[in-house]
Amino acid sequence: MLEKIKETAEYIKAHVSNIPKTAIILGTGLVELVNHITDKQEIPYQEIPNFPISTVEGHSGKLIFGQLGNKRIMAMQGRFHFYEGYSMQQVTFPVRVMKALGINTLFVSNAAGGMNPEFKIGDIMIITDHINLFPEHPLRGKNYEELGPRFPEMSEAYSHRLIADAKKVAEENNIRVVEGVYVGTQGPTFETPAEYRYFHRIGGDAVGMSTVPEVIVARHGGMEVFGVSVITDLGVEGIVEKVSHEEVQKAAALAQPKMTLIMKELINKFKE
């Protein structure tokens, strides 16, 4: 794995003149942020050695390097999901490469089903913590000290200072945000009413099929992390409704302007 990480990082360095210190994974609901990146340089995943290729509708599959306001960033447009058949090492490989490139702050986004009765469709949830219910752990197997410690500490998986900054940005722009715990599951089925009840009772506020593996690997490598979910459907007891991928994308698209504004201003505001 170390050789693959090195090979991929060297390929990117050879094709990108100025590697940033900040990266963002553009999940469902944050695709519009690409339109705010200037001086762009794009590399399709299929051209990058050892990179998997995303198969999900709405995830296009390329690395974008450019300027977002006053910050130079790397944006990952299209992520890899465990339910697509990739191993956890493949799902999290891009995060390993980010660390090898010298990136030290990671912003992640996703679409999620809300389980907190206070949530509404279209809400933006700042992730304060997560519950990992994936059947395989991304750090399972041999540990390489070059990548991080055998037993990483996870008491602050999501940066407290970035959470505070994001809340300020939302307040300054009169945007409603909620906070909560994200439950990560493998998918690809949406949750049953009983699963929604269970996930909420064990402490979850929203549930989705991504993010947790990437965050674990980022923290393993010592990166600072900020995460945000757009609530695209509700699994609140008594009002669970049928949901489809198309409906999730539609709800995420409606929330994009608010989510984009928060992320853009937060990235510009924080100190690397």
Residues of each region from the PLM?
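Generic non-transmembrane alpha-helical segments
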Residues: Y11, H15, R161, D165-R176, ...
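Metabolite-binding pocket within alpha/beta catalytic cores that recognizes anionic/polar moieties
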Residues: M1-M154
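Metal-dependent peptidase/peptidase-like ectodomains
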Residues: N143-Y182
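Non-catalytic positions within long, well-ordered alpha-helices that form the structural scaffold/packing
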Residues: K99-A100, H200, R219
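Active-site/ligand-binding-proximal alpha/beta "capping" segment
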Residues: V169-D205
